[in-house]
Amino acid sequence: MSEPFKSGFVAIVGRPNVGKSTLLNHIIGQKIAIMSDKAQTTRNKVQGVFTTDESQIIFIDTPGIHKPKHKLGDFMVKIALNTFQEVDLIYFVIDASTGFGRGDEFIIEKLKNVQTPVFLLINKIDLISPEDLIKLIEQYRELMDFEEIIPISALEGNNVPNLLEQTNANLEIGPMYYPKDQITDHPERFIISELIREQVLQLTREEVPHSVAVVIEGIEKNPKTEKLTINATIIVERSTQKGIIIGKQGQMLKQIGMRARKEIESLLGSKVFLEIWVKVQKNWRDKEHYLHDYGFDREEY
């Protein structure tokens, strides 16, 4: 007789830039959580759905937990903390190459108050020696009683199959929440805006920080050619940032558009014409009605 089907929700938490989105994208096999080496790139709870014949795991990729500096930061931390209560299992991801940080202390204090089992995932193990890894495991073991401690490399995929096996062992018997071929419950508009935002963050580096939102104004399909026309607006806080994003003779914006278009085409599997505008909206991160307009939901505060 075949084993009963299992399912459950898993939250991925950790300091900014420890590789949470990389891990989610490796497991799902498609780019659904924005990846960039800047802190604070994941803003909304992106759900990735991983389904096999035996089980379905719904992943929730939370924003990096950090002490908030403004309303947007406050919002992001609140989402992450609320998530702990809603899931069946928590992956707490740390970066082996940077070791124990003050941010980890902040997260561990929060995790200690939660009933949910926690897996400690030591990521980027390819960057440290086995001796240092053992020391790190011992250091974290003293801080908290983890359900499992699993060293991985999210980028290379090392030990990820073992992680999924341990995850399945911790799931309860449950239904298939999403159709088998569905990998995320985020509408396509949201993922398209995230792919554009990823390119802005990657290409402009520190010059344009997190004061960037992307709004998809419209998506139209040409019935004859099947080609999609997507109109998007990049929102920044200062006109100097607008200048940086547009670049000399529009070169930077052209680069952003070209790279984002390739990502969007591979996501949607169809040809895309992408038109991007840049707009200045002063201090949008501190104005609630703008946060709502740009996809941040008040109910999650």
Swiss-Prot record:
Coiled-coil intervals in this record? none
Task: Locate the region G1.
Answer: 14-21
Gene3D superfamilies from the xrefs? 3.30.300.20, P-loop containing nucleotide triphosphate hydrolases
Instruction: Cite the binding residues for GTP.
Output: 14-21, 61-65, 123-126
Biological process annotations from GO: ribosomal small subunit assembly
Print the keywords alphabetically: Cell membrane, Cytoplasm, GTP-binding, Membrane, Nucleotide-binding, Ribosome biogenesis, RNA-binding, rRNA-binding
Its quaternary organisation is:
Monomer.
Family note: Belongs to the TRAFAC class TrmE-Era-EngA-EngB-Septin-like GTPase superfamily. Era GTPase family.
Q: What is this protein called?
A: GTPase Era
**Organism, as annotated:** Listeria innocua serovar 6a (strain ATCC BAA-680 / CLIP 11262)
Provide the gene name from the record: era
